[in-house]
């Protein structure tokens, strides 16, 4: 099944195999000593016999990641934001450092060195895959441990596909993920919330902050609310709000590559040549769809604002 030849000063192991399409191929591997060649011959014959032989492939990490992204984004219905962030991570934090490495040649030690390099890398060193010239001040602001942990998470998923594709036998990542130092967010207490509401003079902003504080609505959910989401007669007159959509800005490149059924509406561009669009889309998870109950004060302010908005629409001149 395999043979050892001695062309010159080295020893070569010659064997035949079939690629993924069933095409017959020949393999040649060179070694400095006869012992190394004999050990490789035994290994190759065993792998060819039990079906664990790894078909040689020159695919690089960059090629593998750009093959994986469309599959992963379609399979898991990525949002435009997730797609954009993942592509940016590949372009700026992975490809410049290990993108040209062959997937089959990458070892755990290489990934450990890669993580160590990222820990010393300034934020914004690469933008759209292009190296930037940074100021001395910018060079001091290094990538966070959270960013490096996110790179690890992305690579772990991508390399699991490489295993399924029979590119590699096992994921080359270290068992222990880079530690992410999470910072605890500070939350306003009751006095701060009350002071904020008493200070805000703009009615629309006041209502938005009120909705965020009382119902824990996110910014995109508040901006995505429509009159049909408000039911002032429900819950014995307390009123309810249906949160089932969110507004966000998304890159047009991402929108072209993702499931259009995720987007309810794309708003017209205000600037010609804009690379992003404002969209109204489905929430990230089904659990985000929920009915929320208003208190008396919130119900009154919401009803008042909804009435003014309706009156404003009625006063607009109709297009002829």
Locate each region found by the language model.
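N-terminal DNA-binding recognition helix of tyrosine site-specific recombinases/integrases
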Residues: 1, 89, 93, 101-109, ...
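N-terminal DNA-binding module of tyrosine recombinases/phage integrases
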Residues: 5-12, 16-112, 128, 310-320
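Conserved tyrosine-mediated DNA breakage-rejoining catalytic core shared by Y-recombinases
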Residues: 7, 192, 225-304
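Phosphate-coordinating loops and pocket residues in cytosolic domains that bind phosphorylated ligands
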Residues: 66, 105-108, 120, 198, ...
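Short, basic (Lys/Arg/His-rich) helix/loop patches that form interaction surfaces
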Residues: 123-127, 198, 202-205, 215, ...
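Short pre-functional
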Residues: 153-160, 206-223, 240-241
